[in-house]
């Protein structure tokens, strides 16, 4: 118990604070610049590890980033399978306005292939929760979810970015965590926690809304969803029921938005 396997994207995140967002054809100057490793899979693995789960993480990066990414994950206590690919890693450009709202553009970069999942099969089999996102290819997620189903590992899907999902894959998912805009088409997944940003989240089966606490003004919402999912996975792997796990994930995400950027904003349990 308490094991989480994560499969997802790792890349370089470039943060720029701007006085306001662009209008059409406009160039504006950023007020600050910050660069760190990120990606939904990477951030969620870190969040689960900081919430005291035993985390295994499968990802792909460009060859130039393989060693520093492995070192960063090792420093977080994450058992990693970082596959080096030719070409660049993923990149994300993140603009943040004074209210903490963001605009994000992602270049997908190095991609996992379905066959990369096979060497990760023992980690999936040993996990209590397999955490997936739509940042990796559908065939990769389907291969991983099939291995999870064969070994009794529950699949948690963060369905971002939104895309249509085949019924064959959705049948393998136990729990999804869409936001209000990603929820369409996921009704046949057995359970969902619908994230509502500053308003908290909603457990679909019970209709119960769980408000998010406040730990101060929001300065940066980037990565709040990743924190929510990583902490939710860690709590579920520990044996907590869904409502209790969602309450804890809500609080962790609410705390994260009071700190700028992502890695330094992901809280440590305790």
Identify the meaning behind each predicted range.
Residues 49-50, 149, 237:
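Gly/Ala-rich phosphate-binding loop of Rossmann-like dinucleotide-binding domains
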Residues 61-63, 161:
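Residues in the short beta-alpha loop(s) of Rossmann-like NAD(P)-binding domains
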Residues 1-10, 70-84, 94-209:
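Ribokinase/PfkB-type carbohydrate-kinase core domain
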Residues 1-58, 68, 218:
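Glycine-rich phosphate/adenosyl-contacting loop at the front of the ribokinase-like
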Residues 184-270:
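Conserved phosphate-binding/catalytic region of the ribokinase-like
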């Amino acid at each position: 118990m308490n094991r989480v396997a994560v499969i997802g994207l790792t890349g370089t995140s470039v943060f720029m604070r701007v006085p306001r967002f662009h209008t059409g054809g406009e160039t504006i100057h950023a007020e600050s610049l910050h660069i760190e490793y990120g990606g939904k899979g990477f951030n969620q693995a870190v969040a689960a590890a900081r919430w005291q789960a035993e985390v295994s993480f499968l990802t792909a990066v460009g060859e130039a980033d393989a060693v520093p990414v492995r070192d960063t994950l090792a420093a977080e206590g994450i058992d990693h399978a970082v596959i080096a690919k030719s070409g660049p890693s993923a990149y994300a450009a993140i603009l943040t306005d004074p209210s903490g709202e963001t605009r994000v553009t992602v270049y997908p970069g190095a991609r996992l292939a379905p066959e990369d999942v096979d060497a990760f099969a023992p980690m999936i089999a040993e996990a209590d929760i397999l955490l997936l996102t739509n940042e990796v290819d559908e065939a990769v997620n389907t291969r991983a979810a099939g291995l999870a189903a064969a070994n009794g590992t529950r699949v948690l899907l963060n369905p971002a970015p939104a895309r249509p999902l085949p019924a064959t894959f959705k049948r393998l998912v136990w729990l999804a965590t869409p936001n209000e805009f990603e929820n369409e088409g996921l009704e046949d997944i057995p359970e969902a926690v619908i994230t509502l940003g500053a308003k908290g989240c909603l457990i679909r089966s019970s209709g119960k809304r769980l408000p998010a606490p406040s730990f101060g003004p929001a300065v940066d919402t980037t990565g709040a969803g990743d924190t929510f999912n990583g902490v939710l996975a860690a709590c579920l792997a520990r044996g907590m029921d869904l409502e209790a796990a969602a309450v804890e994930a809500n609080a962790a995400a609410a705390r994260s938005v009071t700190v700028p950027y992502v890695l330094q904003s992901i809280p440590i349990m305790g």
